[in-house]
Amino acid sequence: MPAGGRAGSLKDPDVAELFFKDDPEKLFSDLREIGHGSFGAVYFARDVRNSEVVAIKKMSYSGKQSNEKWQDIIKEVRFLQKLRHPNTIQYRGCYLREHTAWLVMEYCLGSASDLLEVHKKPLQEVEIAAVTHGALQGLAYLHSHNMIHRDVKAGNILLSEPGLVKLGDFGSASIMAPANSFVGTPYWMAPEVILAMDEGQYDGKVDVWSLGITCIELAERKPPLFNMNAMSALYHIAQNESPVLQSGHWSEYFRNFVDSCLQKIPQDRPTSEVLLKHRFVLRERPPTVIMDLIQRTKDAVRELDNLQYRKMKKILFQEAPNGPGAEAPEEEEEAEPYMHRAGTLTSLESSHSVPSMSISASSQSSSVNSLADASDNEEEEEEEEEEEEEEEGPEAREMAMMQEGEHTVTSHSSIIHRLPGSDNLYDDPYQPEITPSPLQPPAAPAPTSTTSSARRRAYCRNRDHFATIRTASLVSRQIQEHEQDSALREQLSGYKRMRRQHQKQLLALESRLRGEREEHSARLQRELEAQRAGFGAEAEKLARRHQAIGEKEARAAQAEERKFQQHILGQQKKELAALLEAQKRTYKLRKEQLKEELQENPSTPKREKAEWLLRQKEQLQQCQAEEEAGLLRRQRQYFELQCRQYKRKMLLARHSLDQDLLREDLNKKQTQKDLECALLLRQHEATRELELRQLQAVQRTRAELTRLQHQTELGNQLEYNKRREQELRQKHAAQVRQQPKSLKVRAGQRPPGLPLPIPGALGPPNTGTPIEQQPCSPGQEAVLDQRMLGEEEEAVGERRILGKEGATLEPKQQRILGEESGAPSPSPQKHGSLVDEEVWGLPEEIEELRVPSLVPQERSIVGQEEAGTWSLWGKEDESLLDEEFELGWVQGPALTPVPEEEEEEEEGAPIGTPRDPGDGCPSPDIPPEPPPTHLRPCPASQLPGLLSHGLLAGLSFAVGSSSGLLPLLLLLLLPLLAAQGGGGLQAALLALEVGLVGLGASYLLLCTALHLPSSLFLLLAQGTALGAVLGLSWRRGLMGVPLGLGAAWLLAWPGLALPLVAMAAGGRWVRQQGPRVRRGISRLWLRVLLRLSPMAFRALQGCGAVGDRGLFALYPKTNKDGFRSRLPVPGPRRRNPRTTQHPLALLARVWVLCKGWNWRLARASQGLASHLPPWAIHTLASWGLLRGERPTRIPRLLPRSQRQLGPPASRQPLPGTLAGRRSRTRQSRALPPWR
């Protein structure tokens, strides 16, 4: 069904297929209520189609929290549909009628708790093993399918007619494992289930814990902590150790099985599959043990109901002649206890044992409206019958009740079908024989019509019988207890709702705070991203500006380079033209000169003249060509040189520009990083403040919810105390009514053999007048009896109920507890009466209230005076209590000792198989343990210690004369020290064995394996033994051992006068200078250890070579003003200025001086090299004395104060450039010197 659907809606096909469409009232007949629980009621019914007997569980889903109830019903139906195992209850179907779900299952005779109810004794161990084996098989089936029962207890372990053990009541079960909900019955809950809401999930091992508690319940008739409030039991289960079997009569297999089931850590607890292989459940046992137990229980139930029937008939027929007078209500009240005594539990709250008091949502939600919605027609019929009975008189009403019980008795062996035509109740052959007693008249004078009508109504109600192991009084008592315990279930459900509400409130608060944190982080992230985006935009803008500057500078440099080259080329052209012009003029002049020379010599032939002139011209042209070529070569070299120089200047200028731009970029980035860091720090502070506020809000909410929870728990505890007081009043009033009238007459008589009561001590105050002689009216007598038997025992009952919880309450809470109880706490004068009245209870209660069994917390707080002062047990009270308990019985103000046989007869003890001490029951032949006497501890004798010290000193003196006996002294010293430490003879023998084994193993290792000489091994053994003896004697404070050794060695050497004097002087020096030497050695040792590897240091530290005292001495700042840090911080070492310098300190000073001189020499050589000529620098570099310094590529950042965020400063134009071609000038930079 979807979460938002209506309860009872079948629109969802998956939900609709879970329920049958038929009308259950037409399919099932003879519905009779056979049990009650927190879920509602269980009815016996018969299927009209095949006459099969079934059990119907009616669960209402109307009223408050109807959706939750509907979901729980769907969950249980789905769970039951999946079960297919002989050890689980069989599912027959589920029907819907008038907002009530009819869950039909197979019918079982009863539960394991019914066995305890009927027999009033624990089960035998073989019976517990059989029941546990069947339950384990069912749990193993559930756990193998990832299912958890979560409510395993004796009340949910059912027994069928064939003797099968079946698991029932799956209202708290979980289909998915692991689970994390707080579900189950408090006393059977596992610790992980109790802590599931706070700590995490659990699995099927919680059923193993519940099974262990169920074993204790079957062995002791009640689970552990059963006398405690349910809420208090939850805290004890979660915090205390696991419970164990109290009696010592059980076998070791059973004890081991229970201990295995009750392992506190779930990982150590075995699974159900593993427990099926345990010897406790696999031991041989009779195959019919369950059948025999069922048959014996049926016989006991028959005897109980027959006894109840005889008592009721005797009372009714004896009082019948008096008519419906004033004595009838009184007799009804006297008959009422018999109805309850037949099936009364000895525990304080029987409602926890029989009905399923689950804390699941289904059980809580269906516990209130189950009766009203399930049996409207039956209630109308019962009202009509009650009106008729009121008209007919009390005799007819009691007779109808009696015959109802009779009909229930007669049908325990088989299912009987009676003919509808028979209208006589005694025509049934299975009715018990009722022999008339001598006191019974042959015919009752009551009207015949009244008796016959009552019989007819009883027959109509019980015309068909059914097999069961539950008495009629038990069923009626369960109905009454269900009505009484509805407040408790509502209290538990309210507590669970409060826990759920608190958890939802915390989850809502955490989700809201998580949303605030996410919103805060998103806002901070947006702010950071916006700032980073702004920084990115600024960086891109700066990069574009730098790129524009670089491109502009590059274009300008290229233009200037082209102009520079054109200028040089123009000059070179002019030089070449001038050269060519000069060559022409020179050629003409030379040509004229040659012609003149030829004319001066006319004898030369003309041809020769022409040839000579031609040669001269060629030579001249060749010279001119060479000169022109040389000029061109020089011009080219000059052009290349000038170009290289100009490019170098331009590159240096570009490099300086790039450095300026890069410096500006880095400064900008550093500024942005500083701003981002400041923003992150501010955001971190804001986030930390927000988290601190949220943590404070969460802590305040948790504290408020915890306070509300504690207030609710305290209110529940006070309400529980009030309810227990009311129950105790009713119980004591019933006990007073059950006592013979002779006891009331002898109430003031003193039993023989008791001393007179001491005024102001235990017991009621003595006024000097006998109780018989004191005038009192019948009403005052009843009030006196109620006060003596009711109010005085309420305080003891409250003290027993509270237990350790009451002892651990604060005085303010105890004062509130006393005020809320409605009656003032008893004064110290009433302690005797408290104990007296409590002794006259049941045997289990008497054993629990023995004074020696009280813990100091329970014994210290007894009551509270009206003025608010607390009274404590005194020594006089304890002595009086001890004296009274030693007598075997105590004085009671209104009761006398009743024999145990009479009590059993009045209580209607069942006739069954007797129990023996082997079953876990206390033997009646064993007398009760006397209270322990408080003896003053006597002082321990010092003689054994003196003897051991003297023996060790003597052995040391004897061994000192011969060093070869040192290993023997060690072997003797080890067992003596072990025995002296409290181990006894066993420890001494173990120490001697260890010493011998160690000596033998060392001999085998050293002499046999390593071939060590025997003399060397003996010397090594003597040294080791000497060190061990001295160490052991020093550790155990046996100073006689080293003194004996030293004395023996001194006496063995006669000439020891001078050595003794030297030793005395050395001892004086050691006493004076010893601490300083020890500190120095310790510091040196620690410094050596600290230079080791971490693994070696850790190993030595584990061996004890490093101590905290030495570390604190080495690092004094870690132990400043009493504060010891875990991180050693080296502090300044305080030195005495008068002491001489350490040699290492002098070497360090020399090293510092050498480094200073080296640095000065390097600076001087660098300055000298800057002033040397180039050839000298090249010569020294070729020799290897100098080397060139490479300029770094990392720009030098300016300090924060000198940073300029604006554009770089204007630069002067480079030398050699035109001044008028740029609008801004640029400063020239000097070239760095050559290194």
Curated annotation (Swiss-Prot):
Residues 28-281 form the Protein kinase domain. Changing K57A: Loss of kinase activity. In isoform 1, excluded from the nucleus. No effect on microtubule-binding. This is Serine/threonine-protein kinase TAO2. Its cofactor is Mg(2+). Residues 766-777 have a biased composition (Polar residues). SUPFAM superfamilies: Protein kinase-like (PK-like). The keyword DNA-binding does not apply.
